[in-house]
Amino acid sequence: MAAAEEEPKPKKLKVEAPQALRENILFGMGNPLLDISAVVDKDFLDKYSLKPNDQILAEDKHKELFDELVKKFKVEYHAGGSTQNSIKVAQWMIQQPHKAATFFGCIGIDKFGEILKRKAAEAHVDAHYYEQNEQPTGTCAACITGDNRSLIANLAAANCYKKEKHLDLEKNWMLVEKARVCYIAGFFLTVSPESVLKVAHHASENNRIFTLNLSAPFISQFYKESLMKVMPYVDILFGNETEAATFAREQGFETKDIKEIAKKTQALPKMNSKRQRIVIFTQGRDDTIMATESEVTAFAVLDQDQKEIIDTNGAGDAFVGGFLSQLVSDKPLTECIRAGHYAASIIIRRTGCTFPEKPDFH
């Protein structure tokens, strides 16, 4: 009988073993950008015909915007880029081991590139940048007015990511294979859709978790084909209320109800049938919506004193980072959402997507 009594111990270990945190358990790939953020006025937005709450890619008419922003307003520089922000927040929430999170993207060989490398190292992220000298490191102007932020990304180097020159190299691809969860912001579909698909295929075939973000309304509008090519491989889709509405319109869902949109998105065709798709839409200070195969649930965000909110830029990225930090350990989805709300609540009290030394999440 003694043997039978001792049996539960090894069994318990078996359950916990696959959930142990380790290096490179989370993989992210995206556009590494240096954020140049400032509180601006309505005149500045109007001058460059910017919407208060939007994300766009810089065009010729925005050339002067970056210079004017630096000259006219008090600017702050922060290491940014949507995916990179999320990956850093996830690593911060995980704490140990360092380098639990991996990040790929393209930078220039310049001062801004050096800043991004230093900041990634300080955040204990295992960043492997593709470095090239044809284009300078990308920047993103974050024009803040009140609760809103208008983002204008000048991708530059970020746009030069090459699958065959970086992702396909054995030493880099090995890091993708080590990951249990992969996360890519939809923004990267404008740069290297073939890289996104390669990672998505790999995840689907090996029953890893592939997660994607709708990222901005223009992705659903102008990169619809790339987005829908990858959608069958998406296990978890993130987005905010504006992106969800645009996606629904582009897909002909004929509803403006966010819960209905989440439900219809959840039901889109899916490759890996072992994992049912989960759709998560944040709505700023309103409830976060989660659709699973069986139900749609609303989760209230944490109460926040409006006076404490300094900068909502990065809140969505932080939510994803918090969520992923628990997902890699196989925590329940409700815990993942709670961690996402926690991370976002910390980030909006600070400028840029920055955080204190240690999280206080229990």
Curated annotation (Swiss-Prot):
What controls its activity?
Activity is inhibited by 5-iodotubercidin and 5'-amino-5'-deoxyadenosine.
Q: Which PANTHER family match?
A: ADENOSINE KINASE
Q: Report what the protein is called.
A: Adenosine kinase
Under Enzyme Commission nomenclature, its number is 2.7.1.20
The subunit structure is: Monomer.
Q: Write out the residue ranges of the motif Nuclear localization signal.
A: 8-16
Q: What is the effect of changing G30E?
A: In HMAKD; the mutant shows some residual adenosine kinase activity
* Pathology linked to this chain's protein: Hypermethioninemia due to adenosine kinase deficiency: A metabolic disorder characterized by global developmental delay, early-onset seizures, mild dysmorphic features, and characteristic biochemical anomalies, including persistent hypermethioninemia with increased levels of S-adenosylmethionine and S-adenosylhomocysteine. Homocysteine levels are typically normal.
- Keywords for this entry? Acetylation, ATP-binding, Cytoplasm, Disease variant, Kinase, Magnesium, Metal-binding, Nucleotide-binding, Nucleus, Phosphoprotein, Purine salvage, Transferase
Q: Which residues are listed for Mg(2+) 2 binding in this entry?
A: D147, N148
What is the native source organism of this protein?
Answer: Homo sapiens (Human)
Question: Where are the Phosphotyrosine modifications?
Answer: Y77
Q: Where does Mg(2+) 1 bind?
A: S49
State the source organism's domain of life.
Eukaryota
Tissue distribution is: Widely expressed. Highest level in placenta, liver, muscle and kidney.
Its family? Belongs to the carbohydrate kinase PfkB family.
